[in-house]
Amino acid sequence: MLTTCTFPVAVYAQKGEQIQSITKKPMPIEYYQEQADVWKAELNKNNKNANAWFNYYRANRYVGICSNDTIKGPDRFIKLKSIIDDMEKNIPESYEFNYLKWLNSGNDLTQFNYLEKAYKIDPEREESYPDFVSAYEFKMDIEKRNEFAKKWFAKGNVSPGYLYYNYNVLMSLKPNAILLTVGDNDTYPLWILQAQFGIREDVKVLNLSMLYNTEYIMGMSKLLQFEFIDPLKSAENAQLYAKSIVMRIANNQLKRPVYTALTVDEKFTTPVAEELYLVGLAYEYSKDKIDNIALLKKNMEQLFALDYLKVQFYRDNAEMSIKQANANYLVPMITLYDHYKLSNMKNETENWKNLIVLVAKNSGQEAYIKDYIKE
């Protein structure tokens, strides 16, 4: 999922706050800029304050993400290296330095020892768990990946909304599918569902953001039998590389069904856009025309867990983010609404209309449907 940081202008308190993960609670760039200044002031008072270093780095990292920097991949974090260098001078044996040294490497496995050292210093710090999940995915060590996915879930802080959302993504897929994702919230919950609950372990999740690692893509091309292309030779045009990878995976020799999550930007799927069919919270790739309405009915009416869209029994720690993600339900829901309306099936039409209105309201998409669905 592409993280957005566009919010109404607001004035924030001039005090240091613990910077929450941007994937759970995205804030406007002004917030991160102000927090960077506040934490810098704390460091000027005490340059041994590990917590201040942690939040100072995180605020600056999120400023870079929110600024829509054109530099992608690990290189976009080079400008944060000076912060890491200063941390090494002042708090080299801290959890914060070792964890952020790894994080700033952009999943460079030659720096994995820093992540391991951070974990050894404080194995209860939850923010390291996703990094272990990613690192072991790169290493293609599924047993260790699942171990840390379970540790993460056991902490009790994984968003239930994203677990439900990604459960429904998995329910959109045929057996033995390959699913292409792009972000954190459309990938990690899938691995947690597979590891913790054994749900749809037949599905192979491939995050497009990870396919810039030469060894990883080489390993995956052998495992899934699609044509290998070296990302290092395509570094100057990352978008073309991603498109090329999507095309190659779609034509894998194992003939495994291929899907893209709705969270994948269409710029990545341009080469196969005419061969993608909406089947729920994913698009199915098929060279032959398929009856996707029948698949939508089956998936959304028989397999999806949708009650969480209607009622929440407790606060979701990723409330802002999951509400935005839930807007992805609107297109498949409207597709079924149109189908039933044309078929003059009034009860089904009304049921989907009510859910569409509710989801649109909760996700801030009322303007999107106001002229389409009449109250």
What does each of the following model-derived ranges do?
Residues 14-168, 172-175, 195-375:
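ER/secretory pathway lumenal C-terminal domains and tails of membrane proteins involved
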Residues 180-184, 208:
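Short His-Asn-centered micro-motif
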Residues 1-18:
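Bacterial Sec-dependent N-terminal signal peptides
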Residues 188-189:
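Phosphate- and divalent-cation-binding pockets in alpha/beta enzyme and binding domains
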